[in-house]
Amino acid sequence: MHDDQCFYCAQPLPTSWEVDHIIPWTRHPNDAIENLVPADRRCNGAKSDSLPAIGHIARWAEQLTTRRGDLAALVKSTGWVSDQAHTRAVVRSTYRHLAEGTPLWAAVNRNESFARESWSRLLSDQAESHRAADR
């Protein structure tokens, strides 16, 4: 589903890679496959229980839409729990309640500040993508 790359840094995954919760387990215990991404140890450890930057959320949301078939096949082959609607709702709710300027994890040793304008733009872009996909 992620082309054998770390979701966060796009480097090839090592033989021993980790699974990260996009929305950290400490914020919302959600093990649905849609909340999980492959990560190398360095990125996963650095992100820890931080919320990811809006750019990561945008890429995650796009992959849920464009790789729907890959995700369904993975769920079927592994029997993993899938709940895309709930996971998307958790993401929307989590970011909707953030204070302007909240630090978001962008990369190892780099945070970005939450900007409501960027979040609103992402939500509108996603709504447009969903309308186009439904046509």
Residue spans for each PLM region:
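Short amphipathic alpha-helical surface micro-motifs
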Residues: 2, 19-20, 87
